Amino acid sequence: MIRCLRLKVEGALEQIFTMAGLNIRDLLRDILIRWRDENYLGMVEGAGMFIEEIHPEGFSLYVHLDVRAVCLLEAIVQHLTNAIICSLAVEFDHATGGERVHLIDLHFEVLDNLLE
């Protein structure tokens, strides 16, 4: 069953990463690829993403997940959210020599499948 997730990223957060020499869009893509390849609980049959520009407020990351069991969707979304927050925090820490970035507001919203 395909589910669509949306993650809104504020323009200010993107600028902070850019000032640190990082491209948050590329980081999110790489994190999603690694996460998909791990195949959490064997419940993700496929995953894809695209970015929608929202000028000047930032962008939205849409992730389409093909999940085997909808009852585990909440756990799968939480695992993906944790993977993104932890990975972005580590990348930012390494790029800035120990600086911290506020990522607690990053969370996915589950939408109806936008492909149907």
Swiss-Prot record:
The keyword Acetylation does not apply. One of its GO terms (cellular component) is host cell nucleus. Induction: Synthesized early during infection. Gene3D superfamilies: Mastadenovirus E4 ORF3. Keywords: Early protein, Host nucleus, Host-virus interaction, Inhibition of host innate immune response by virus, Viral immunoevasion. GO terms for biological process: symbiont-mediated suppression of host innate immune response. Changing L103A: Complete loss of virus replication. Forms a multivalent network in host nucleus that inhibits nuclear bodies and prevents antiviral cellular activities. The network is made of multimerized dimers and surrounds adenovirus replication centers and nucleolus. Plays a role in splicing of the major late transcript. Prevents viral genome concatemer formation. This is Early 4 ORF3 protein. The lineage of its organism: Viruses, Varidnaviria, Bamfordvirae, Preplasmiviricota, Tectiliviricetes.
